[in-house]
Amino acid sequence: MTKTVFVLNGPNLNLLGKREPGIYGVATLDDIEASCKREAGQLELQIDFRQSNHEGDLVSWIQEAGEKNAYVLINPAAYSHTSVAIHDAIRSARVTVVEVHLSNIHAREAFRHHSHVSAVAKGVICGFGAEGYLLGLRALAAIAKEEENNGQSIKGA
């Protein structure tokens, strides 16, 4: 059975490739989406790739993923550090989440060191640029395989 992964991207990620390439790299969000689609095909995953600058959209999509028993690979961007709403949506939806960041948030400004999402994520990948998305998909594929082998669903952290 093919598992669906919602790949959710938060604010300002639509500007990738133009916005601070020294921090976030030169890959655009379209480049990352194309790489994710290729990787997902090899991993026998289906992806639903989305981006919004609005917190409520991310909350609604997390809830939708929960209703569809899908996984979530999320780069909440700045909302990582501020959004209790996204934290609560993940907890309420009981969805398996991998959090990803292009930069190493722990090597940046102090206000970026804490993520509200990390506490409810299965795992966190940061600092590997666009490759982090592919690492996240591989992690979710491994979780899907484990669930299939065990005949159960592994939810949350």
UniProtKB/Swiss-Prot annotation:
Molecular function per GO: 3-dehydroquinate dehydratase activity
CDD domains this protein is in?
A: DHQase_II (cd00466)
Q: Where is this site: Transition state stabilizer?
A: R19
EC number(s) on file: 4.2.1.10
Name the pathway it acts in: Metabolic intermediate biosynthesis; chorismate biosynthesis; chorismate from D-erythrose 4-phosphate and phosphoenolpyruvate: step 3/7
Q: What class of enzyme is it?
A: lyase
Under PROSITE patterns, the record lists: DEHYDROQUINASE_II
Reaction catalysed? Answer: 3-dehydroquinate = 3-dehydroshikimate + H2O
Organism domain of life? Bacteria
**Positions bound to substrate:** N75, H81, D88, L102, S103, R112
Pfam families, alphabetized? DHquinase_II (PF01220)
Do the record's keywords include Amino-acid biosynthesis?
yes
GO biological process, alphabetically ordered: amino acid biosynthetic process; aromatic amino acid family biosynthetic process; chorismate biosynthetic process; quinate catabolic process
Q: Where is the active site?
A: Y24 (proton acceptor), H101 (proton donor)
InterPro entries xrefs? DHquinase_II (IPR001874), DHquinase_II_CS (IPR018509), DHquinase_II_sf (IPR036441)
Q: Keywords in alphabetical order, please.
A: Amino-acid biosynthesis, Aromatic amino acid biosynthesis, Lyase
Q: Which family does it belong to?
A: Belongs to the type-II 3-dehydroquinase family.
Function of this protein?
Answer: Catalyzes a trans-dehydration via an enolate intermediate.
Q: How does it assemble?
A: Homododecamer.
Name used for this protein in its record: 3-dehydroquinate dehydratase
Q: Give the originating organism.
A: Brucella canis (strain ATCC 23365 / NCTC 10854 / RM-666)
**Gene encoding it?**
aroQ
